C-alpha cells in the first residue's frame, strides 16, 4: 500500500486489486501495475472478455426467446395470451425504468470521472508551475551574479589595486559569488538531467483524452435516454414502425453497453492496481524517462522526516557563502569606501545584488521544500484514485444496467409489436390492467373532460 502522507488506498481499490489476474493460458500473473508487460495486458484483456462472454449469453437468451415466441405463439389460448400481453407491456416499461435509473447513475459517474481527471491535470499544472519557477529563479539569480562578477567586482578590484588587503577581500567575494552561482546551477540541473521534466505536456495529453472520453459517454447516455423515451412513446401510441426501429437500435446499443462494460471493468482493475501502490510505479517511470536522482524523487514522493532533503548541503553552503559576502561587503563599506570614494557606487551595486540574491534564495528554499510538490502529487492521486475510481465504478454499473435493460427490451418489443397488429379489429383481447390500453386511455380522457 502507498505510504504517501495524506493518501491511503480506498477499500474498493483494495477489493479490485485482489481480483485474480489471469493470462490467456489461464495462468495467474502478478497484480502489480505493469501496463508495458504483455502478461499484464493479457490479464486486463481477459477481464474485459468477461463482458464479451456476458454478451454471448445475452444473445443466446434473446435467440432462444425469439424462437420460442415465433414457434409457440399460435398455441396460446385467449386467457394466456391476454395475461402475456400485460406482462410484456409491463416488462418493457420496467426495462425502460431500469435503463433510466442506469442513465442517471451514468451521468453521475461520468461527472465524477471528469472531476477526478480535472484534479489530476490541475495538480500537474501546479507542479509544472513550481518547477518552472525554480528554473527561472535559479537562472535569473545566476545571471545576476555573473553580471556582478564581470562588471562591478572587476571594477572594484581595479580601484583597490594599490591596496592588497582590499584586493584579497574582493577576490574572496568573487569566489563566494561564483560558489553560490555554481551551487544554484547544480540544484537546477537535478530537475533537468537528461530528458526535460515537463508535467504540463502530460497534463495536456490527459486533458485531451479526457475531453473525448467525456464526450463519448455523454453521447452514449443521450442515445440511451432517447431510445427509452421513444420506446415509451411507441408503446403508448402503439406505433408499429417505431417499435421495430427501437428494437433494432436497442440491439446495437446492447452491443455498445457490453463493450463499454468490458472496457470499464479492465480500466477499474488496472486503476486499482496502480492506486494500491502508486509510489513505486511513479518513481520507476519518472526516473526512467527523466533520469532524475532517485533520492530527489523519494524526497518529494514521501516527504517525511525519514527522508533527508537532498538539497540541504548545497543550500547550506550557499547560505554560508552569502553570509560571508555580506560580512566582506560590510568590511569594505566601513574601511575601503572612505579611502576610495569612487568605489562607493560599485559597492552599493554589489550590496543590492546581495539583497536580491538573498530574497531569491529564501524563495528558492521555499519552492524546493517537499510540501508543495508533494501536495500536488497527493492531490493528483486523490483525484485519480478517489473520484476517478468512483466514477468508473458508477459507469460500470450504468453499462451493466443498460445491457440488462436492452436485453429485456429486445426480447419484449417484438411481442409488443405483434400485439399491435390487430388492435383496430378487436379490443376484447386486451387486458383492462394494460397501462397502454387504447380504450382505457380514451375513457380516462372522457372522464377528465367531464370534470
From Swiss-Prot:
Please tell me the species this chain comes from.
Answer: Xenopus laevis
CDD domains from the UniProt entry = Tweety_N
Q: Where is this site: Essential for the formation of the channel-pore?
A: 163
Protein family according to the UniProt entry = Belongs to the tweety family.
Query: What is the gene called?
Result: ttyh1-b
Q: Name one Pfam family in it.
A: Tweety
Q: Where in the cell is it found?
A: Cell membrane
**Under what name is this protein listed?**
Protein tweety homolog 1-B
Role played? May act as a calcium-independent, swelling-dependent volume-regulated anion channel (VRAC-swell) which plays a pivotal role in the process of regulatory volume decrease (RVD) in the brain through the efflux of anions like chloride and organic osmolytes like glutamate.
